[in-house]
Amino acid sequence: MEEALEARPRRWIDSLTSLRIEHYVPKLRKNRIREQRIHNEVIVDAYGPEEQALGWYYYLENKIQFPFSARCMAAKVVSPLRKGETVDVRSLAPEDSCAHDMLVLIRWHGRNVAVPLSQLTATDADESTVEAIGDWHYWLAQGSCF
């Protein structure tokens, strides 16, 4: 068992021991416009992880027009979706559910299910929605988290 763990990348082991949620999104090149928008509209007055989460929640709530269609970009352990599945996104999950990740509610097999926004890309949405989701993906890709 120890040999198997030693073969794993160190970052993976560190994330397990600290119980930190890791987002495996490819790192994007710096985007000055996006950086300024995120700073000025999302985290400008945030003095800690809880306030950053609230900043993101209200930013996304104001910018995203629900409902919209989205496709799953990658499967995640915490979500029932498989890569390539298309879903209708109905709303943000309740605020208290988004303290560690931004979750959205979808209708899936006759049930309302919360899934990470980070695993979805909008396929039929307005410009504001696409931009807001892109900002969230960008922030995660830069290695940021709450």
Model-predicted regions and their roles:
Residues 5, 121-122, 128-131:
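Lipid interaction determinants
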Residues 12, 16-78:
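Mixed-charge, Lys/Arg-rich low-complexity intrinsically disordered regions
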Residues 29-34, 129-146:
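Long, low-complexity intrinsically disordered regions
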Residues 73-75, 107-111:
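Short strand-coil-strand connectors
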Residues 77-88:
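Short coil-to-beta-strand transition motifs
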Residues 90-92:
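Residue-level recognition of beta-strand microenvironments
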Residues 96-105:
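Short aromatic-glycine-enriched beta-strand elements
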Residues 111-120:
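A short macromolecule-binding patch
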